[in-house]
């Protein structure tokens, strides 16, 4: 399986029901490569929307991860920071479905499962119904309260299993 084929497989999964085009990896003469999006006729898609551009890069990352796993080379965890911030609710669901089917350690830092509602301490509540759809071990990272807002040394993190 080639890198482009694997990337386009993931691009399709991440963009169900939306325009997705095709990922192309263009080799440059200086041993570099450029990732572009093309239309069915092969013409380049300039300035795709933020969500499509994000899924294009994600699809390449997933493809590299898949191909290195197949070749039994180094298997590294995937780490994402706010990966779905530009996604609609449906596209966010597609992302988590794809992640759920990748058989490797994945760490995702996101606020996607926090609600506008707060508890008695003023902390955002977790949307447990939405979170229950994610088939993975889940943790919440939050600030230990109280802390002094003017003294960095008072900041501590709490990891809570969900």
Mark where each language-model region is.
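Conserved ABC ATPase signature
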Residues: 1, 34-62, 83-89
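Eukaryotic, compositionally biased intrinsically disordered regions
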Residues: 22, 30, 84-87, 97
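Conserved catalytic network of the ASCE P-loop NTPase/AAA+ motor domain
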Residues: 48, 68-73, 98-102, 115
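Glycine-rich phosphate-binding loop
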Residues: 50-57, 79, 105, 120-121
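Metal-dependent nuclease catalytic cores in nucleic-acid-processing enzymes
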Residues: 61-69
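Walker B catalytic motif
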Residues: 74-83
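C-terminal lobe/lid and adjacent interdomain/linker elements of RecA-like ASCE P-loop ATPase modules
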Residues: 91-162
